[in-house]
């Protein structure tokens, strides 16, 4: 009798746990993912600014973005980092989100290129944004939003893009959007910054 009860308990736990995993996957599948680009070398800053805290409790800039994204309905976060500071990143950033939201790492490496491409001799500088996003191709299968980890956005931005991503028909491909800012609101009085100008044509493209 005791053995039977023991096996029944094991079966119950097995099916319950797998049921919960299935439900979580279904729920998270309906939510967009936030992809944070955090592999920068910080050459001008002089260090890993993505790990430096600036909030009252040591919050980083990306912590504020992640909080706002979660409030806007995002269901997973993925970080693109460099392998050489993985341990430091896990300890300072990733650990705080365990049990709160699914979080994963992927790594940007200079020689991780599509077939047919190679690193030019003498190249040491990391590739740009497109290459960083490509590093997450095997992890992200759902609609996602890309941000830089050292830029400050605001909750409204995540609400707007989160709504767009959540309303995409299942199986949609090549559907894109961008949340823009008025240029004047992005300039600093403490130095020069580079900004891109975006415009729309008569067809709203």
Question: What do these predicted regions represent?
Answer:
Residues 4-5:
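Ala/Thr-enriched low-complexity intrinsically disordered regions
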Residues 13, 19, 23-36, 42, ...:
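Conserved N-terminal catalytic core of the sugar/cofactor nucleotidyltransferase
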Residues 40, 150, 182:
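Active-site glycine-centered loops adjacent to acidic/histidine catalytic or metal-binding residues
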Residues 42-46, 187-188:
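Short N-terminal binding/cap micro-motifs at the start of the first secondary-structure element
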Residues 51, 105, 176-178:
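Conserved beta-strand scaffold positions in the cores of enzyme catalytic domains, especially
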Residues 155-205:
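Conserved core of the sugar-phosphate nucleotidyltransferase
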């Amino acid at each position: 009798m005791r053995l039977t009860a023991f096996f029944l308990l094991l079966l119950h736990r097995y099916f319950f746990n797998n049921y919960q995993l299935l439900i979580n996957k279904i729920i998270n599948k309906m939510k967009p993912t936030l992809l944070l680009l955090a592999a920068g070398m910080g050459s001008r800053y002089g260090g890993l600014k993505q790990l430096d805290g600036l909030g009252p409790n040591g919050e980083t800039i990306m912590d504020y973005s992640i909080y706002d994204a979660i409030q806007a309905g995002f269901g997973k976060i993925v970080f693109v980092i460099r392998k050489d500071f993985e341990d430091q990143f896990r300890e300072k950033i990733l650990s705080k989100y365990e049990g709160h939201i699914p979080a994963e790492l992927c790594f940007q490496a200079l020689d991780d290129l599509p077939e047919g491409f190679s690193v030019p001799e003498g190249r040491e500088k990391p590739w740009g944004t497109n290459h960083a996003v490509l590093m997450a191709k095997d992890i992200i299968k759902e609609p996602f939003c890309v941000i830089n980890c050292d830029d400050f956005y605001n909750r409204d931005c995540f609400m707007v893009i989160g709504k767009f991503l959540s309303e995409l028909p299942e199986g949609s491909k090549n559907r894109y959007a961008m949340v823009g800012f008025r240029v004047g609101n992005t300039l600093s009085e403490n130095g020069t910054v580079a900004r891109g100008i975006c415009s729309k044509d008569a067809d709203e493209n």
